[in-house]
Amino acid sequence: MIVLGIDPALGSLGWAVVARQLTKLKYLASGIIKTNSKDEIHNRLACINSTLEKVILEYQPNMAAIEETFVNTNSVTSLKLGYARGAIMSLCGRYNLDIREFKPNTVKKTVTGYGHAEKDQILHMIKLLLPGTSLITNSDEADAIAIAYTCHVMRVK
């Protein structure tokens, strides 16, 4: 089973690919997709989709795990994040990926044992749980790894 973990965002989206090999989880790859806030939204969404599509084609995941988003006090920000999530889900649907969504607190609790963990705690635990992640420094990327990890752990339960 190969899971594509996604920390959705319009400005700096984190993605990660984590595979289960027998009883072990293996980190395969991760990255961030940055878009320019000055670009039109459709161009930003196209950038996200084209980059994620390359990841899907290269790693052939069976499933996508996406962090659920909370409603921001700024309705415009929430709406734009909704656009990004919709574009991502549409892309996953085009490649017949099963989609699982996880609340941020669930991801934090699964990875750190504490549902209100800080970004640096998630980053620290990811490095302990998955060999190959020691050079990860970006919190969006770490969140995506944590989301993929959570998906694997939750599927076993």
UniProtKB/Swiss-Prot annotation:
GO CC terms of this entry: cytoplasm; Holliday junction resolvase complex
Residues the record lists as binding Mg(2+) 1: 7, 140
Active site: 7, 67, 140
Residues binding Mg(2+) 2, per UniProt: 67
Tagged with keyword DNA damage: yes
Top EC class, one word: hydrolase
InterPro entries: RNaseH-like_sf (IPR012337), RNaseH_sf (IPR036397), X-over_junc_endoDNase_Mg_BS (IPR020563), X-over_junc_endoDNase_RuvC (IPR002176)
Molecular function via GO: crossover junction DNA endonuclease activity; DNA binding; magnesium ion binding
Required cofactor names: Mg(2+)
Pfam families reported in the protein's UniProt record: RuvC (PF02075)
Entry keyword set: Cytoplasm, DNA damage, DNA recombination, DNA repair, DNA-binding, Endonuclease, Hydrolase, Magnesium, Metal-binding, Nuclease
Quaternary structure (record): Homodimer which binds Holliday junction (HJ) DNA. The HJ becomes 2-fold symmetrical on binding to RuvC with unstacked arms; it has a different conformation from HJ DNA in complex with RuvA. In the full resolvosome a probable DNA-RuvA(4)-RuvB(12)-RuvC(2) complex forms which resolves the HJ.
PANTHER family, alphabetized: CROSSOVER JUNCTION ENDODEOXYRIBONUCLEASE RUVC
Function: The RuvA-RuvB-RuvC complex processes Holliday junction (HJ) DNA during genetic recombination and DNA repair. Endonuclease that resolves HJ intermediates. Cleaves cruciform DNA by making single-stranded nicks across the HJ at symmetrical positions within the homologous arms, yielding a 5'-phosphate and a 3'-hydroxyl group; requires a central core of homology in the junction. The consensus cleavage sequence is 5'-(A/T)TT(C/G)-3'. Cleavage occurs on the 3'-side of the TT dinucleotide at the point of strand exchange.
Protein name, entry field: Crossover junction endodeoxyribonuclease RuvC
Species this chain originates from: Rickettsia akari (strain Hartford)
